């Protein structure tokens, strides 16, 4: 009697998405918000570290080009010693004695923006600074600034940047350990040493990920350059696939959307190859937002694989076969799908929403060992119940930067234990998407046997609820699109006149690309804090205004008015506590 066949291993692809929008004013070059460099020293550094210390672990990373542009820009600022980020410049200022009231206000307003439970409260000296601020602020906003000495501001700046340091740095860097131990009365030398360290951390990030890729331990993919929602650039009505009858912008379409989408894709491919010495074969569409036309556009540009959310898959299966009821998730989720128009094709991986969201939203509340045990048991259950001769493929896809501030120690123990558990599990194999594609295209050269399904129809949507409700469909979001549409009409007309030089045209195109990013529309929602909405509302209108300036056209009066008047009213009715202020972390939009 033959022994029972060993079931094929479960293949897990963990895919971390890294993104920050462009926080620069492209006319002045100044950074309006500091989140890119703060996430760099905390999350991008830690995420590389966990792969570096566990050589058996495998993962994929998506880096949006505009994020990498900013990281390189920060590195250049440190080299030139000309810092264009106001908060970072204050950390590196020779002395804080005699700084302006505006600079003092920036320090006080900025340096408590974090997740207080995990990033402020654990540090007694930092928490004491917050308590002093709370007492001083009771005398009134204008007067309170007079109570803060240069020493207080120095300590606050140092502690804020220490709190934002990655856990791997806190544990292994002697300077950071000594500053945390010192706790207070930081002198100018302490502050400047920390400033220098930040420059070193940022400058080493891209080389670290490149080295991991060259070792074959990770795959790095890209995103259309400024993170636009491709399906909406192509057709607003794609919204109706998942949101029938939803309100749309007054403009019927975004003029020249296809050409703009291609520009974002090609720009991403070019910059990625320049940075990592290889052309990316994978592309994460911003927010996992796909439509049939968007997918084919990527395929035409040579993209071999992409990914989206589970909701898009279920909606697409219904659209492909409306009369067939969906059965168990095991029957349709744990395999990639091929999408084709008969000429071009692309492989699409679909996110296991339940497992991905547990990492993103649930496991932070659990002890790391319990969380890892739960995750592995879920995978073991999928493996045990997958009664097919092929390897089941589980795609865990999530934000690689914003979840960790909710975890103890920035997710240090969770990530360390997760990678160890998966890398050493006898029935689980950590793989990249390209390895799975190889198993599909050249099975004779692969260790794996992967079945690739066919998906005749795509229901346009994103990884957030399977729809575009986070970026379009509400009054404020639609107004945001209409403002962009009108700016694009002016852009097209101005370029046709021939009155702009080649350099001026390039500056205008770069500024337009910033305005086309998805983040402005995400933040125009009442599910985010009023302070967050106001901050991004102002930055979006500032970017649109800058576009008109570069086009040498008058700025429309409506760009002086907040898009979300309700948020403005909320801010006018009272101060928002620092603990509620934005820390670069987005919330999910509402289900439509």
Regions found by a protein language model. Give the residues of each.
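Active-site and substrate-binding clefts of carbohydrate-active enzymes
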Residues: 6-179, 322-591
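Short linear interaction motifs
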Residues: 32, 41-44, 186-209, 493-494, ...
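Short, solvent-exposed turn/loop segments enriched in Gly/Ser/Thr/Pro and often Arg
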Residues: 62-67, 224-227, 282-290, 434-437
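Structured, charged N-terminal subsegments at the starts of enzyme catalytic cores
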Residues: 164, 196-227, 234-237, 241
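Gly/Pro-rich turn-and-neighbor structural signature
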Residues: 191, 198-214, 224, 251-254, ...
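Positively charged, amphipathic and often flexible ligand-engagement surfaces
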Residues: 229-232, 241-259, 264-265, 311-317, ...
């Amino acid at each position: 009697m033959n022994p029972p066949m060993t079931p094929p291993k479960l293949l897990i692809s963990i895919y971390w998405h890294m993104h920050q929008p462009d926080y620069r004013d492209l006319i002045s070059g100044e950074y309006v918000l500091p989140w890119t460099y703060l996430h760099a020293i905390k999350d991008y550094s830690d995420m590389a570290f966990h792969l570096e210390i566990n050589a058996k672990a495998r993962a994929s990373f998506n880096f949006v080009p505009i994020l990498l542009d900013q990281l390189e820009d920060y590195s250049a600022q440190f080299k030139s010693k000309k810092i264009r980020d106001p908060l970072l410049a204050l950390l590196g200022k020779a002395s804080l004695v005699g700084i302006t009231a505006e600079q003092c206000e920036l320090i006080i307003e900025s340096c408590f923006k974090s997740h207080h439970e995990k990033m402020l409260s654990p540090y007694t000296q930092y928490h004491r600074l917050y308590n002093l601020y709370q007492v001083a602020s009771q005398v009134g906003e204008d007067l309170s600034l007079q109570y803060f000495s240069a020493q207080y501001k120095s300590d606050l700046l140092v502690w804020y940047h220490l709190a934002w340091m990655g856990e791997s740095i806190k544990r292994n860097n002697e300077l950071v350990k000594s500053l945390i131990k010192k706790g207070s009365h930081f002198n100018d030398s302490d502050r400047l040493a920390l400033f220098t360290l930040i420059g070193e951390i940022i400058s080493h990030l891209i080389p670290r990920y490149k080295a991991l890729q060259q070792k074959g331990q990770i795959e790095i993919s890209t995103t259309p350059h400024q993170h636009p929602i491709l399906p909406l650039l192509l057709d607003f009505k794609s919204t109706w696939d998942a949101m029938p009858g939803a309100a749309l912008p007054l403009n019927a379409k975004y003029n020249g959307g296809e050409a703009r989408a291609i520009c974002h894709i090609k720009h991403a491919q070019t910059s990625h190859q320049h940075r990592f010495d290889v052309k990316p074969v994978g592309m994460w569409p911003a927010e996992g937002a796909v439509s049939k036309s968007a997918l084919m556009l990527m395929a035409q540009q040579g993209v071999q694989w992409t990914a989206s959310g589970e909701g898009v898959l279920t909606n697409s299966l219904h659209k492909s076969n409306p009369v067939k009821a969906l059965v168990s998730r095991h029957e349709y989720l744990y395999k990639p799908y091929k999408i084709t128009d008969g000429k071009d094709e692309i492989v699409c991986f679909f996110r296991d929403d339940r497992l991905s969201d547990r990492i993103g939203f649930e496991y932070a509340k659990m002890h790391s060992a319990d969380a890892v045990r739960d995750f592995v048991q879920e995978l073991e259950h999928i493996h045990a119940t997958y009664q097919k001769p092929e390897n089941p493929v589980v795609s865990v896809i999530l934000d690689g930067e914003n979840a960790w501030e909710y975890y103890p120690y920035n997710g240090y123990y969770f990530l360390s234990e997760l990678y160890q558990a998966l890398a050493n599990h006898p029935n689980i194999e950590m793989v990249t998407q390209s390895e799975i594609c190889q198993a599909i295209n050249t099975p004779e050269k692969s260790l794996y046997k992967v079945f690739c399904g066919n998906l005749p129809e795509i229901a346009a949507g994103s990884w957030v609820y399977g729809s575009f409700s986070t970026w379009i469909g509400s009054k404020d979001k639609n107004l945001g699109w209409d403002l962009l549409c009108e700016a694009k009409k002016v852009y097209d007309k101005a370029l046709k006149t021939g009155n702009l030089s080649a350099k001026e045209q390039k500056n205008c195109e770069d500024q337009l690309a910033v305005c086309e990013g998805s983040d402005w529309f995400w933040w125009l929602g009442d599910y985010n804090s009023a302070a967050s909405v106001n901050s991004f509302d102002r930055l979006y209108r500032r970017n649109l205004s800058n576009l008109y300036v570069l086009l040498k056209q008058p700025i429309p009066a409506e760009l002086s008015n907040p898009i979300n008047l309700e948020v403005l009213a909320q801010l006018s009715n009272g101060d928002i506590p620092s603990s509620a202020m934005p820390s670069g972390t987005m919330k999910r939009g509402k289900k439509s």
